[in-house]
Amino acid sequence: MFLTVKLLLGRRCSLKVSGKESVATLKKLVSQHLQVPEEQQHLLFRGQLLADDKYLSDYSIGPNASINVIMRPPEDAALDKTHQTQPLWLQLGQVLDKHFGAKDAKTVLGFLRQEHEERLQRLSLEALEQLVGQLLAQQQLDELAEEKEAPAVASELEQNNGGGGGGGGTGGEGGGKKEEEEGEEADQ
């Protein structure tokens, strides 16, 4: 059977395989034809991630099926990103240097570190659990607000791009502000 394998960036190839082939074997073929290293490939069929140790027949992949390839960054690139961020105390020291003399900035930073350590020692497990609960609740509210905001922005773009007729465009802006205000009220 023939499978069409597509990269998100538009490259594609057609591969002849049997249903008895493993996903790992398919990854090798994809690597040869599309020059995507096997360890960077995620293969998807109908939105389902294919496991390397399974066979194509396990996913009921038939002739003329289409497999999507998503490239994940190499693991060493992910490690580089984590090392690029500066520690809090270094960043704070740089900010203090801008506003104080070098000696004063070092003294203030020392006091801040000492106070930070003292407060960490006084924190109870209950207080940490409460803080985590609040942060998770805020994160969920932010995600809900983003989900509500995305369709509103899309509909406003449609109106501004000729979908709304000749209303001058001011009505769309007012509606967006009202939705923002409603979202803020819901957050409180």
Curated annotation (Swiss-Prot):
It holds the Pfam family Tugs. One of its GO terms (cellular component) is cytoplasm. It comes from the Eukaryota. Residues 1-76 form the Ubiquitin-like domain. Keywords: Cytoplasm. It is found in: Cytoplasm. The keyword Mitochondrion does not apply. Expressed specifically in post-meiotic male germ cells of the testis. Abundantly expressed in stage 14-16 spermatids. Residues 161-174 have a biased composition (Gly residues). Gene3D superfamilies: Phosphatidylinositol 3-kinase Catalytic Subunit, Chain A, domain 1. PROSITE patterns: UBIQUITIN_2. InterPro entries: Ubiquitin-like_dom, Ubiquitin-like_domsf, Ubiquitin_dom, Ubl4_C_TUGS, UBL4B. Residues 146-188 are annotated as: Disordered. PANTHER family: UBIQUITIN-LIKE PROTEIN 4B. May have arisen from retrotransposition of the X-linked Ubl4a gene during mammalian evolution. This is Ubiquitin-like protein 4B. The gene is Ubl4b.
